[in-house]
Every structure is written in C-alpha cells, then in structure tokens.
Amino acid sequence: MSKDIIQGVWLSGKVHIITNQVVKEQIKPIAAGQTVVADCSHLLVFAAWDTYTAERINKVYDHLTEVRGFTNAGLDNYRQRLLNGYPPRDAEVNFAHAARQAYIAFSMAIVAAAFEGVDATPMEGFDPAALDELLGLREN
C-alpha cells in the first residue's frame, strides 16, 4: 500500500485517506467522472465491511486498548457481547448495519471538517465493485 493512502479503522469498516494524485485520477471514472475526486487534496473513502468476523472485532479492540491505553478488563464484556452477537448473524444484516455505521463515521468527519473550516464535498456515485478492486478493499 502506498504511503499516500492512510487507513483508519472503526468496528464496522475503514476510512482510506487518499492523497496520491495518480490514484485519485484512477478513481475519477469510477466516481461517474466527478471532477472533485481528482481536484481535492484529500479523498476520504469510507468502506464498510461486508460482514463482521471474530478476527475483525478482536483486531479493532486490541488496537483500541493499545492506542488508548485501556485495560482489556474495561472492554471485555462489550467485546464478548459483539463476538456473541455479530458474527453469527446473516451477512446481509451485518453489511446493512456496517453501511449505516459508515454513514455515522462519515457524518462525524464532515462535521469535524466544517468545524476546522475545511471545505468538504460529501458524495456518492462510486462503482463499489470497481473501487473495491482498485483499492484492494476485499483483501482488507
């Protein structure tokens, strides 16, 4: 992965911050030719996971405890509840949930950008399969 693509993770997916101009130009036709994709300084792609797995849940919580310095004891009950509830559910139910969570994360980013005085253009119109392939999202 390029150093020009930074990833952040939350329980339901990842945000990819793309600054590489070549990659942004490759995304433009995938985004119905919307020029703002190539013209922006930073393109944020909020990618929802297709389903929840024990591995993904554990990875997020292990990262959370490491970065924030939490003890596992404080999160173990919640983690266990997620592990017992999410992975066994139907993949379509999980994807719909993850997509809604992506919109929540996206909304927070837009609010933060506005607060900081950063111009932001919320948009849809991407070809999901083509974007998945270009950014290697299925492997992540």
Predicted regions and their residues:
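Acidic, surface-exposed loops and disordered segments
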Residues: 1-140
